[in-house]
Amino acid sequence: MQQDDKPGAKSAGKAWSGRFAEPLDSLTQRFNASVSFDQRLAQFDIAGSLAHARMLARAKLISAADLAAIERGMAQISGEVLSGSFPWSLEREDVHLNIEHRLTELVGDAGKRLHTARSRNDQVATDMRLWLRAQIDELTGLLRAVREGLIDLASKHTDTDRRAHV
C-alpha cells in the first residue's frame, strides 16, 4: 500500500487521521474545530502544560534543558495569545494542538516531549477545571460587589419609610 493509499494519509497530523481514507470536507472541519471556543482556554492550557513539564523534569523524564526550553516557549506563546498575535489554525482543530505545534516550532523536540505521560483527555479536563475555577472566582467577586453595594444602600436608607413592604 502506497503512502497516499493508506487511511488518513491525506489528513496527516490529525488526531483521527488513521480512521479515514479521505480528508474531511472543509465545512465538516469547521464544524468539528473547537479553536474559536478553545481560545479562552489558552492561558489555562499553558499553565497546565507548565505544571506538567515541571513534573516531568522532577521525575527525570525530561532534562533541565528541555524544561527551560518549554518554559521559554510557553512564555512566548502566552505573550502572543495575550497580544492577539498567536497564529491560530483551524487545521490544528483545538487549543492543545495549536499550542503544541507552536511550541515545537519555537523549541524543537523539547516541545514534543511535553506530551509524555499525558493524554488529550487529561489536558481537556485540566483546562476546563482551571477555566471554571477562574470563572467561579470572577463571579464570586462580582456577587461580593453586589452584596456590598446592597449593604451600603441599605445602610444609607435605614430611616426610609417602606410602608408597601409590611
Predicted segments, located by residue:
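A helix-coil-helix interface module used to build multimeric assemblies
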Residues: Q2-V166
